[in-house]
């Protein structure tokens, strides 16, 4: 259970400002405190799967852009930044842990293409992990993020082929009855085949 008074005391001890407890709608707009550059935060979130950071980034982006609720902000993002996704996107929070968030591999590949055109390749390889957790693969050609929930595994990112092409990919494996290591091994085989064939 969260102890709000303890959190308030810790914040008062740390922040050089007045700390007031309350819901956003009770407190008004407030003041955003400028924090560190976003790249180190994104890198931490991508490498350690920090779902709390993901949620906080979404909340802050919502506030900076002037949206009252997360629902209206997500609707805006779906109709603007992600309007070109090929499949319907069900997006209810930023944590990535909600059973209500639903996406497809095709959508993730399209989102990766959008990212590819928004930032440099050097930024991509800085943000995306270049390792599988089992470290059985030569990692220098795959930059990808894993996602794992019970009986669900995902791997989405970029692959550099032998010819130097950069491809976006996404695997989503669910409801499997074999050990997760077998899923990872088969994914690795497919990625190696694509790397070598193209």
Predicted segments, located by residue:
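A small/polar active-site loop signature that marks catalytic segments
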Residues: 1-122
